[in-house]
A protein has these predicted regions:
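A short helix->loop->beta-strand "cap" motif at the edges of active sites that frequently abuts
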Residues: 44, 95-96
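Short gly/pro/ser/thr-enriched loop/turn and capping motifs at secondary-structure boundaries
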Residues: 104-109
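Activity-critical C-terminal alpha-helical subdomain
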Residues: 94-95, 127
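Short hydrophobic/aromatic-enriched beta-strand-loop microsegments
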Residues: 96-103
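Cysteine-cluster motifs in flexible loop/terminal segments that predominantly coordinate metals
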Residues: 110-199
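Nucleotide donor/acceptor-binding cores
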Residues: 11-12
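Short, small-residue-biased leader/transition segments that mark boundaries at the very start
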Residues: 1-6
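Cofactor-cradling patches in redox/metallo enzymes
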Residues: 15-80, 84-90
Length: 199
């Protein structure tokens, strides 16, 4: 459930962001409200921001600027949105741990409104909470979820020499926010089964 996201950070101060932008994406409103009430009752919420299209950087930055005092008070930022929105927030709030509060499931042909190159594979098994807001599925050309392959050279991918190694980016990000311990967390290997195979 959504509560599992927060258990690892129990007792810490959190700022919550809700994105209601895409009609194509089902927002888990009931579960989100329940979790936010629970956290607020514990006195752990520094603030809540609800907006639309946080994947649009100009819109997102203007909205966040109004809440920066409350964000600075928080130990982490909990984002209820698709993976693209979480990555946009993580890029902007460089010194904060940004957590995805829900998994993103496939919406054929739809990827939000961001003009930036944040990518979400809509895999339904979000790894952003362990990787500092950088998706290993899309940032790594091999979609490795358990660390670097060892083949990169000078920070570049061995498969695509023009591409920066996704796991080196993840390592730098986790180091910047003081969360290298996340690399020691056990990783659930990605399930590539199709819907038909799961029936």
């Amino acid at each position: 459930g959504l509560g599992d996201v927060y258990k690892r950070q129990a007792g810490k101060k959190v700022f919550i962001i809700n994105c209601h932008g895409c009609k194509e994406v089902r927002f888990p409103e009931k579960e989100a409200v329940e979790l936010q009430k629970e956290l607020s009752a514990e006195g752990n919420v520094t603030g809540i921001m609800t907006t639309d299209y946080i994947c649009n950087p100009e819109n997102m930055q203007l909205r966040l600027q109004k809440h920066m005092d409350k964000i600075r008070e928080a130990d982490l930022v909990l984002v209820f949105s698709c993976g693209v929105g979480v990555q946009t927030i993580a890029e902007y709030l460089e010194d904060k741990m940004v957590c995805a509060a829900c998994d993103t499931y496939p919406v054929p042909g739809f990827q939000g409104v961001t003009p930036l190159e944040y990518k979400c594979d809509q895999c339904g098994e979000c790894y952003l909470n362990l990787t500092g807001g950088i998706c290993p599925i899309t940032a790594c050309s091999k979609s490795l979820v358990n660390g670097q392959c060892g083949g990169s050279k000078n920070g570049k991918c061995e498969v695509d020499s023009e591409m920066e190694c996704g796991w080196e980016r993840i390592y730098r990000r986790l180091k910047e926010i003081g969360r290298l311990d996340a690399l020691k967390c056990p990783t659930q290997i990605h399930n590539f089964a199709t819907d038909d195979e799961l029936k």
